[in-house]
């Protein structure tokens, strides 16, 4: 996943896009505050490596924090591109999980990148993969830059009908 992210970042810089990168492991003690960094964001890339099953604990914590503490009005205007690479199995399930979570948060998921790669050297040695990453990154850029509308989805309809989280306006520390 890091190889793919580095390539994406390279392409975005060529397009003069400001990129801020957060490694959830490095911010593990402050994950609950990260949703506040989304306030001036047009797009977000949620990237994870599936080494066994699922999206990983830190990513789940981040999404939970977006649900509990994130500004839903702001998230509603943020495009999300999932990037998932698997070393065993489950990349499609992880993309689905990230996409559905972002939809439930009210955000705008767009097509991302997912694949199975046993060894990073497979990515590095095949220029075709670089072209795929570049193309998907350019598509992501266009979607965000042109503010491409998305079709409504049932996750939003269900959320509007059956869920209502009362905002208690608690800080992360108070919520604990």
Regions inferred by a protein language model and the residue ranges of each:
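N-terminal beta1-alpha1-beta2 submodule of the flavodoxin-like/Rossmannoid cofactor-binding fold
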Residues: 1-71, 131-176
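Short, glycine-/small-residue-rich phosphate/pyrophosphate-handling segment
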Residues: 76-129
